[in-house]
Amino acid sequence: MKELDLDAGNSGLKWRLVESGRVIDRGIIIYGANAQKWSMPTKGACRAFVSSVSSKEVDDAIREVLKDIKDVFWAKTASSYGSLVNAYADYASLGVDRWLALIAAYSKYPEDLCVIDCGTAVTVDYVDKFGVHKGGYIAPGGALMLKSLNVNTAALKGTYGYDSELIPGSSTRECIERGVYYMQKAFVLSVARRCAESRIVCTGGGVKALLGNDEAYTYVEDLVLDGLRIVANAVPVN
């Protein structure tokens, strides 16, 4: 039985095709492309699981792509899941991606945790060994910082990326790229130090650039999608 997992984020959509519990295909779609040309292997999939923090337009495009799949599950944030308890008074306002990442992390590692997701935004969430969510932080990711400088500072317009060299730059480009990288790395290391006795679980496309292969961190490639499958498979099939 083939099942399609989708994680619709702020700037792109991550998908993977699972058969008998094994990932057999995966891909990433960057928004902006015509939804009719989105390439996902929907043919043969009997179920689809969706996590989305994106716009109504993206959600509508997903529904169109999945229209031939009978059983489609859309994840929602809850006040609790098993022994995991959401810290937000308005629990539904916690992004479903953060919630699913917490579910996956705590299911894999039921201990004191710091969960870091480096994407368009960098999110940090803490949970204790009893499953009590202690809240967290949200900060702009590197691409957002670079875009802000590009849009709001006329003299700095240009196309920039990450530069992991931490010595001071000797050109405007180097100063911007290294400065943004330094801010990102300092933020992540700072929140990690706050929970030095906890397991630090990291995910997201930007985490490798910031942390490399540091063994002090537990890297899980598909943390949100893993949490999505945990929740979806707990719901009876229609």
UniProtKB/Swiss-Prot annotation:
Transmembrane segments: none annotated. Keywords: ATP-binding, Coenzyme A biosynthesis, Cytoplasm, Kinase, Metal-binding, Nucleotide-binding, Potassium, Transferase. K(+) binds at D117. Its cofactor is NH4(+); K(+). A monovalent cation. Ammonium or potassium. It catalyses: (R)-pantothenate + ATP = (R)-4'-phosphopantothenate + ADP + H(+). SUPFAM superfamilies: Actin-like ATPase domain (SSF53067). HAMAP family: Pantothen_kinase_3. Catalyzes the phosphorylation of pantothenate (Pan), the first step in CoA biosynthesis. NCBIfam families: baf (TIGR00671). This is Type III pantothenate kinase. It comes from Hahella chejuensis (strain KCTC 2396).
